[in-house]
Amino acid sequence: KIKDLGYTPGLQPEADYYAVKMPVFSFEKIRDADISLGPEMKSTGECLGIAKTFDEALYKAFLGAGIKLPKFSNMIMTVRDEDKDEAVEIGKRFEKIGYKIFATKGTAEALTEAGVKAIAVNKIEQSTPNLMDLILGHKIDLVIDTPPQGAEHSKDGFVIRRSAIETGV
């Protein structure tokens, strides 16, 4: 009988540790590839962080995946119009944990109108300083980019995402 082997019905007893499994993507190794995530994306591996607390296990998983944790707590947001309401909620959360938010004009206006502090920066094709100066100057820890449809806008989004990966953002 299974019971004779020491197994009991029900859930496994709670462990005294946390385990966090994290996917690993090889974006930086695939030059000139668009790194936007979609449902068809597959990771090239995974790593595991194990510790006595969830925060420490998550930290170890980030380190194992090669993800650098923020140095400056600066972020760029540039989102399409239909994503602005959701961007406001995300902006509020990041502002609450101490992030300084740089955003393109339309996104900055949406954030500011909702009470989120945002510093407007120029788009790629506009004069410097622009958002690429911040990324290439290694002043940014996080980029949230949801580019609108269309060839020119898609090109901008590609450049933003690719530059972020290549500079370790």
Spans of features found by a protein language model:
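ATP-dependent carboxylate/acyl-activation modules
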Residues: 1-169
